[in-house]
Amino acid sequence: MDMFEYYGYFAEENRSDKLIEAENRVIDALFDRYLPGSGDLLDSSAGTGRNAFRLANLGYTVTAGDFIMDHVETIRANPESAKLKETYCSSAHRLSAFGNESFDAVISLGSMYHMRTKAEREVLVKESLRVLRPNGIFAFSYMSPMAMTFGQYFNAMRTYKTQDRMKAYRKLANVEKTHVCDMFHGMSLEEMTDISREYGLKILTVASTYGLLYDMADEIEAMSEEDYEAFVKCQINCCEDPVVARYCMRGLFIAQKKELDLFD
Protein backbone atom coordinates (compact mmCIF):
# COMPACT_ATOMS: atom_id res chain seq x y z
CA MET A 1 0.00 0.00 0.00
CA ASP A 2 1.52 3.35 -1.04
CA MET A 3 0.79 6.70 0.63
CA PHE A 4 -2.02 7.60 -1.76
CA GLU A 5 -3.79 4.29 -1.06
CA TYR A 6 -3.10 4.60 2.68
CA TYR A 7 -4.57 8.07 3.02
CA GLY A 8 -7.42 7.24 0.70
CA TYR A 9 -8.38 4.42 3.04
CA PHE A 10 -7.62 6.15 6.34
CA ALA A 11 -8.88 9.63 5.42
CA GLU A 12 -9.78 11.75 8.39
CA GLU A 13 -13.49 11.77 7.59
CA ASN A 14 -13.45 7.98 8.07
CA ARG A 15 -11.54 8.15 11.36
CA SER A 16 -14.14 8.77 14.06
CA ASP A 17 -13.12 6.29 16.75
CA LYS A 18 -12.56 7.48 20.30
CA LEU A 19 -8.81 6.93 20.12
CA ILE A 20 -8.50 9.38 17.21
CA GLU A 21 -10.89 11.77 18.95
CA ALA A 22 -8.64 11.68 22.03
CA GLU A 23 -5.60 12.46 19.88
CA ASN A 24 -7.40 15.41 18.32
CA ARG A 25 -8.26 16.78 21.74
CA VAL A 26 -4.62 16.55 22.83
CA ILE A 27 -3.56 18.36 19.64
CA ASP A 28 -6.19 21.04 20.23
CA ALA A 29 -4.93 21.59 23.78
CA LEU A 30 -1.33 21.91 22.58
CA PHE A 31 -2.21 24.29 19.74
CA ASP A 32 -4.28 26.44 22.10
CA ARG A 33 -1.30 26.57 24.45
CA TYR A 34 1.53 27.25 21.98
CA LEU A 35 0.23 28.79 18.74
CA PRO A 36 0.27 32.60 18.66
CA GLY A 37 -3.52 33.03 18.92
CA SER A 38 -3.93 34.97 15.67
CA GLY A 39 -2.17 35.77 12.42
CA ASP A 40 -1.37 34.08 9.12
CA LEU A 41 -1.15 30.30 9.45
CA LEU A 42 -0.09 27.68 6.92
CA ASP A 43 -1.38 24.13 7.34
CA SER A 44 0.88 22.37 4.85
CA SER A 45 -0.45 18.87 5.57
CA ALA A 46 -4.10 19.70 6.03
CA GLY A 47 -5.62 16.31 5.24
CA THR A 48 -9.35 16.90 4.88
CA GLY A 49 -9.19 20.13 6.85
CA ARG A 50 -9.98 19.29 10.45
CA ASN A 51 -7.25 21.48 11.99
CA ALA A 52 -7.48 24.16 9.29
CA PHE A 53 -11.20 24.70 9.87
CA ARG A 54 -10.85 24.74 13.64
CA LEU A 55 -8.04 27.29 13.55
CA ALA A 56 -9.89 29.46 11.04
CA ASN A 57 -12.86 29.47 13.40
CA LEU A 58 -10.52 30.66 16.15
CA GLY A 59 -9.57 33.69 14.07
CA TYR A 60 -6.43 32.66 12.19
CA THR A 61 -6.04 33.53 8.51
CA VAL A 62 -5.49 29.99 7.25
CA THR A 63 -3.93 28.70 4.04
CA ALA A 64 -4.44 24.94 3.74
CA GLY A 65 -2.71 22.47 1.46
CA ASP A 66 -2.23 18.73 1.07
CA PHE A 67 -0.32 16.52 -1.34
CA ILE A 68 -3.41 14.39 -2.11
CA MET A 69 -5.85 16.09 -4.46
CA ASP A 70 -8.83 14.14 -3.10
CA HIS A 71 -8.16 15.71 0.30
CA VAL A 72 -7.97 19.20 -1.20
CA GLU A 73 -11.23 18.63 -3.07
CA THR A 74 -12.85 17.45 0.19
CA ILE A 75 -11.71 20.67 1.87
CA ARG A 76 -13.05 22.79 -0.99
CA ALA A 77 -16.40 20.97 -0.93
CA ASN A 78 -16.86 21.76 2.75
CA PRO A 79 -18.98 24.90 3.36
CA GLU A 80 -16.41 25.98 5.95
CA SER A 81 -13.81 26.35 3.19
CA ALA A 82 -15.13 29.88 2.72
CA LYS A 83 -13.34 30.71 5.99
CA LEU A 84 -9.96 29.73 4.51
CA LYS A 85 -7.78 32.22 2.66
CA GLU A 86 -6.48 29.69 0.14
CA THR A 87 -6.29 25.97 -0.63
CA TYR A 88 -3.71 24.21 -2.78
CA CYS A 89 -2.27 20.79 -3.64
CA SER A 90 1.43 20.23 -2.97
CA SER A 91 3.80 18.41 -0.65
CA ALA A 92 4.71 19.97 2.70
CA HIS A 93 8.35 20.27 1.60
CA ARG A 94 7.51 22.07 -1.64
CA LEU A 95 6.39 25.57 -0.66
CA SER A 96 7.80 27.58 -3.59
CA ALA A 97 4.38 29.20 -4.12
CA PHE A 98 4.93 31.23 -0.94
CA GLY A 99 7.36 34.05 -0.31
CA ASN A 100 9.85 34.30 2.49
CA GLU A 101 8.44 35.10 5.94
CA SER A 102 4.78 34.89 4.85
CA PHE A 103 3.30 33.19 7.93
CA ASP A 104 3.15 33.58 11.69
CA ALA A 105 2.73 29.82 12.14
CA VAL A 106 3.37 26.72 10.02
CA ILE A 107 1.91 23.36 11.01
CA SER A 108 2.58 20.06 9.26
CA LEU A 109 0.80 17.06 10.76
CA GLY A 110 1.42 13.80 8.94
CA SER A 111 4.22 14.62 6.50
CA MET A 112 7.42 14.44 8.53
CA TYR A 113 7.11 10.75 9.37
CA HIS A 114 6.86 9.93 5.67
CA MET A 115 10.21 11.61 4.99
CA ARG A 116 12.37 8.51 5.31
CA THR A 117 15.73 10.16 4.68
CA LYS A 118 17.39 12.88 6.72
CA ALA A 119 17.81 14.98 3.57
CA GLU A 120 14.05 14.94 2.94
CA ARG A 121 13.28 15.88 6.53
CA GLU A 122 15.73 18.77 6.42
CA VAL A 123 14.14 20.10 3.22
CA LEU A 124 10.75 20.10 4.98
CA VAL A 125 12.23 21.99 7.93
CA LYS A 126 14.12 24.50 5.76
CA GLU A 127 11.12 25.25 3.54
CA SER A 128 8.79 25.60 6.52
CA LEU A 129 11.20 28.00 8.22
CA ARG A 130 11.76 29.96 5.02
CA VAL A 131 8.08 30.91 4.83
CA LEU A 132 7.84 31.46 8.61
CA ARG A 133 8.36 34.89 10.11
CA PRO A 134 10.93 35.45 12.89
CA ASN A 135 9.51 34.38 16.26
CA GLY A 136 6.84 32.38 14.41
CA ILE A 137 5.72 28.93 15.51
CA PHE A 138 6.58 25.73 13.63
CA ALA A 139 4.86 22.45 14.51
CA PHE A 140 5.10 18.98 13.02
CA SER A 141 3.89 15.56 14.06
CA TYR A 142 6.29 12.67 14.43
CA MET A 143 6.27 8.94 15.02
CA SER A 144 8.73 7.49 17.50
CA PRO A 145 11.42 4.86 16.84
CA MET A 146 9.67 2.69 19.42
CA ALA A 147 6.47 2.84 17.36
CA MET A 148 8.37 1.58 14.31
CA THR A 149 9.95 -1.27 16.29
CA PHE A 150 6.76 -2.31 18.06
CA GLY A 151 4.75 -2.17 14.84
CA GLN A 152 7.11 -4.54 13.04
CA TYR A 153 7.40 -6.75 16.14
CA PHE A 154 3.64 -7.25 16.19
CA ASN A 155 3.71 -7.95 12.44
CA ALA A 156 6.29 -10.67 13.06
CA MET A 157 4.35 -12.20 15.93
CA ARG A 158 1.18 -12.37 13.83
CA THR A 159 2.97 -14.31 11.06
CA TYR A 160 2.41 -18.08 11.27
CA LYS A 161 4.56 -19.41 8.42
CA THR A 162 8.11 -20.20 9.51
CA GLN A 163 9.90 -18.65 6.54
CA ASP A 164 7.73 -15.53 6.62
CA ARG A 165 8.30 -15.11 10.34
CA MET A 166 12.07 -15.33 9.93
CA LYS A 167 11.91 -12.67 7.21
CA ALA A 168 9.74 -10.51 9.46
CA TYR A 169 12.26 -10.76 12.31
CA ARG A 170 15.12 -9.83 10.01
CA LYS A 171 13.09 -6.86 8.88
CA LEU A 172 12.53 -6.03 12.56
CA ALA A 173 16.30 -5.92 13.13
CA ASN A 174 16.65 -3.45 10.26
CA VAL A 175 13.74 -1.34 11.52
CA GLU A 176 15.33 -1.15 14.97
CA LYS A 177 18.56 0.08 13.37
CA THR A 178 17.16 2.54 10.80
CA HIS A 179 13.88 3.62 12.45
CA VAL A 180 12.23 3.10 9.04
CA CYS A 181 9.32 0.70 8.51
CA ASP A 182 7.64 0.60 5.11
CA MET A 183 6.44 4.17 4.37
CA PHE A 184 7.11 5.48 7.90
CA HIS A 185 10.09 6.94 9.76
CA GLY A 186 10.45 7.20 13.53
CA MET A 187 12.18 10.40 14.68
CA SER A 188 14.19 10.38 17.88
CA LEU A 189 14.20 13.23 20.38
CA GLU A 190 17.93 13.53 19.69
CA GLU A 191 17.27 14.25 16.01
CA MET A 192 14.72 16.90 16.98
CA THR A 193 17.34 18.53 19.19
CA ASP A 194 19.91 18.44 16.38
CA ILE A 195 17.44 19.96 13.91
CA SER A 196 16.62 22.74 16.35
CA ARG A 197 20.29 23.62 16.87
CA GLU A 198 21.03 23.49 13.15
CA TYR A 199 18.11 25.64 12.02
CA GLY A 200 17.69 28.12 14.85
CA LEU A 201 14.64 26.77 16.64
CA LYS A 202 13.71 27.15 20.28
CA ILE A 203 11.83 24.02 21.31
CA LEU A 204 8.63 24.89 23.16
CA THR A 205 7.40 21.33 23.65
CA VAL A 206 7.66 17.76 22.43
CA ALA A 207 4.49 15.95 23.38
CA SER A 208 2.75 12.62 22.94
CA THR A 209 -0.56 12.84 21.11
CA TYR A 210 -1.25 9.14 20.54
CA GLY A 211 0.12 6.38 22.74
CA LEU A 212 0.96 2.81 21.79
CA LEU A 213 -2.66 1.82 22.22
CA TYR A 214 -3.69 -0.16 19.13
CA ASP A 215 -4.79 -3.12 21.21
CA MET A 216 -6.79 -0.84 23.53
CA ALA A 217 -9.03 0.54 20.77
CA ASP A 218 -11.99 -1.74 21.53
CA GLU A 219 -11.59 -1.17 25.27
CA ILE A 220 -11.61 2.60 24.78
CA GLU A 221 -14.63 2.44 22.48
CA ALA A 222 -16.52 0.58 25.22
CA MET A 223 -15.69 3.12 27.94
CA SER A 224 -18.45 5.00 29.70
CA GLU A 225 -18.48 8.75 29.04
CA GLU A 226 -17.07 9.36 32.52
CA ASP A 227 -14.21 6.91 32.07
CA TYR A 228 -13.48 8.22 28.58
CA GLU A 229 -13.26 11.81 29.82
CA ALA A 230 -10.87 10.66 32.56
CA PHE A 231 -8.79 8.87 29.90
CA VAL A 232 -8.59 12.00 27.72
CA LYS A 233 -7.73 14.18 30.70
CA CYS A 234 -4.91 11.79 31.58
CA GLN A 235 -3.62 11.91 27.99
CA ILE A 236 -3.53 15.72 28.09
CA ASN A 237 -1.98 15.92 31.56
CA CYS A 238 0.81 13.45 30.71
CA CYS A 239 1.53 14.34 27.10
CA GLU A 240 4.45 16.76 27.64
CA ASP A 241 6.43 14.50 29.95
CA PRO A 242 9.72 13.74 28.12
CA VAL A 243 9.51 10.00 28.76
CA VAL A 244 5.92 9.83 27.51
CA ALA A 245 6.92 11.82 24.41
CA ARG A 246 9.82 9.45 23.71
CA TYR A 247 7.71 6.29 23.85
CA CYS A 248 4.51 7.42 22.15
CA MET A 249 3.26 6.24 18.80
CA ARG A 250 2.67 9.75 17.48
CA GLY A 251 3.63 13.08 18.94
CA LEU A 252 3.86 16.79 18.26
CA PHE A 253 6.99 18.94 18.05
CA ILE A 254 6.40 22.67 18.53
CA ALA A 255 9.16 25.27 18.32
CA GLN A 256 9.70 28.98 17.80
CA LYS A 257 11.85 30.36 14.99
CA LYS A 258 14.59 32.44 16.54
CA GLU A 259 15.22 35.97 15.35
CA LEU A 260 18.86 35.74 14.34
CA ASP A 261 21.36 38.35 15.47
CA LEU A 262 24.88 39.22 14.31
CA PHE A 263 26.39 36.35 16.28
CA ASP A 264 24.23 33.61 14.69
Listing of model-derived features with the role each one plays in the protein:
Residues M1-G37, R50, R54, F138-K167:
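Conserved class I S-adenosyl-L-methionine
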Residues G49-R94:
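Class I SAM-dependent methyltransferase SAM/SAH-binding core
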Residues S96-V106:
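A short acidic, Gly/Pro-enriched loop at the edge of an enzyme's catalytic core
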Residues A105-A119:
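A short SAM/SAH-binding and catalytic strip from SAM-dependent methyltransferases
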Residues M115, E176-E191:
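Acceptor-substrate binding/catalytic loop of class I
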Residues E122-P134:
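A short glycine-rich, Lys/Arg-flanked "PGG" loop and its adjoining helix->strand segment in the class I
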Residues T205-D264:
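A C-terminal cap/extension of S-adenosyl-L-methionine-dependent methyltransferases
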